[in-house]
Amino acid sequence: MTIAQTTHGPVEGREKEGVLLFSGIPYAAPPTGPRRFRAPEPHDGWKQTRQALKFYPAAPQYPTGGMTAAVPVRWDEDCLALNIATPAIDDARRPVLFWIHGGAYRTGQGNVPWYNGAQFARNGDIVVVSIN
């Protein structure tokens, strides 16, 4: 396991085939309750190491079948999270590819296998970030 320091607190990721993967890192407060249908608010952060080993749920959406039907999907309003693939945690200044999935505001998520940025991170020496 690998620990990375973020502005919100430490996160624990995993190494797979030469790439460090961090999944399900919240980037905003959950958009639930009084925050529902409002602009995102900052996340309070955490003091203990947070596991970033599995994807966060996708935003609620109408099930359309199509490409995402091949992958089991968990939906929840608490879905604002990042997935990060990086070759290393060091002082190197790498380019960042920030991937926003398609779906015409009706479907889609950053958690599907074909959006996995590990190969880009490994072969291109870049950091890949996807979001939900």
Language-model-derived ranges and their functions:
Residues 1-131:
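Non-catalytic accessory segments of hydrolases
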